Amino acid sequence: MSDWQTVRTWLAGTYSNRAQAMAEPVWFIPVTLWYVEVAGLFGEGAGFFTEQVSEHTPNQPYRSRVLQLLDNPLRLENYRLKDQKVWAGAAKDPERLGRLRADDCEQLPGCTLYLERRGETFTGKMQPGGGCRLFPGDASYVEIEFELGERLFFTLDRGFEATTGEQTWGSRAGAYRYLKQLH
């Protein structure tokens, strides 16, 4: 199987960091994270809808995004949804998610995650330099790095103030360690 196909297969699923949150409740809340492949979303590669929810507020999904998995180089392009509210909760609603189209999304320049195989996992990182901004004119930038395995997804998402470099949001205690839920 090609690296592209392996990432596609491994990424799709439902993840939870409950074990981490129970072991380190001061630093982590229990979160469920979905990566749902959306057939035919883009003209090339594979499209994924991703969303997360705190297990304390299971009916309030947040951080909905769309990713496009591409090859040569192996990478994930990040997209924001033009109308977050319309798609909130769609990770658990296949019928609604089936209506998602590329024109419902807006690419986030500078937010590409470049993937590299490292033994039995893949690592993903953005180009350094603070180029990933969620909205034009943002005074802060985002940095994301992750490790993906067949049954794990460790991710460190952080926001920084552009002029000072001070971290403004995200984990200060390391990556969220998600394990794939087998149903």
From Swiss-Prot:
Family of the protein in this entry: Belongs to the CpcT/CpeT biliprotein lyase family.
Enzyme class label: lyase
Organism: Gloeobacter violaceus (strain ATCC 29082 / PCC 7421)
GO MF, any single term: lyase activity
Family matches, as Pfam families: CpeT
Gene coding for it: cpcT4
Its job: Covalently attaches a chromophore to Cys residue(s) of phycobiliproteins.
Keywords on record: Lyase
EC numbers, comma separated: 4.-.-.-
Coiled coil: none
Protein name: Chromophore lyase CpcT/CpeT 4
Xref: CDD domains: CpcT (cd16338)
